[in-house]
Amino acid sequence: MASAAAATTEKGSPVVVGLLVMGNIIILLSGLALFAETVWVTADQYRIYPLMGVSGKDDVFAGAWIAIFCGFSFFVVASFGVGAALCRRRSMILTYLILMLIIYIFECASCITSYTHRDYMVSNPSLITKQMLTFYSADSNQGRELTRLWDRIMIEQECCGTSGPMDWVNFTSAFRATTPEVVFPWPPLCCRRTGNFIPVNEEGCRLGHLDYLFTKGCFEHIGHAIDSYTWGISWFGFAILMWTLPVMLIAMYFYTTL
């Protein structure tokens, strides 16, 4: 009788059940947050996808799509895990563990993919510079798309080129092929403008007067945009994985006691 009572107590340990319920509630809430965060990433609020797409390093967004699936799956499976813990059924716990392991692997792939491609773009300003010089003002679909992107960034962020206006002077470019340096050494949108979008002093800008020319580069803004996407996908994803692992280990222990 005593051994049977002990087995029953072991099987229905309120501490283990409580830990599983609490852990899975946090996972399901985190899954919803990850889902919302990665939907925001795929919406591309900074509108820099063309910049990453032309380099073939747009897998930050591929990682986001995987994370959308994983975020929703974390919510569903963690909700199931709460029920499995409360029901104390081996078959339900085993199903929960198998499903969670599959999601865990996919989320690992999402985090690693996003971070590695982010590192390739952000740690290499020369790549962004090369793209800008190659495609800005180029007469192609990619050229027109990249030209619109750079025009918008330079206007909104009040910047010029990747590192500064001298990018357009020190290197050959598609822009230079269409606009000689004596006509305009850098794109006219590098000029400071009034509230009515009129250049403050176009001639002063053309001559490089610092009061009429944007002197900072745009790479800081581009890097910040890519970092923002990566933090949402990779680092938050890694945080969820770090929490999920001990919850899964507790679930494995709980399974052995049933």
Swiss-Prot record:
Post-translational modification comment from the UniProt entry: The N-terminus is blocked.
Tissues with expression: Bladder epithelium.
Cytoplasmic side of membrane: 1-14, 87-91, 253-258
InterPro entries named in the record: Tetraspanin/Peripherin (IPR018499), Tetraspanin_animals (IPR000301), Tetraspanin_EC2_sf (IPR008952)
Extracellular side: 36-59, 113-230
Function: Component of the asymmetric unit membrane (AUM); a highly specialized biomembrane elaborated by terminally differentiated urothelial cells. May play an important role in normal bladder epithelial physiology, possibly in regulating membrane permeability of superficial umbrella cells or in stabilizing the apical membrane through AUM/cytoskeletal interactions.
One Gene Ontology molecular-function label: structural molecule activity
Positions annotated with a glycan in the UniProt record: N170
A GO cellular-component term linked to this record: endoplasmic reticulum
Transmembrane regions: 15-35, 60-86, 92-112, 231-252
Keywords on record: Disulfide bond, Glycoprotein, Membrane, Transmembrane, Transmembrane helix
Membrane topology annotation: Multi-pass membrane protein
Homology family: Belongs to the tetraspanin (TM4SF) family.
Subcellular localization: Membrane
GO aspect biological process, one term: epithelial cell differentiation
Main location: membrane
Organism this protein belongs to: Bos taurus
Record protein name field: Uroplakin-1a
Subunit text: Homodimer; disulfide-linked. Interacts with uroplakin-2 (UPK2).
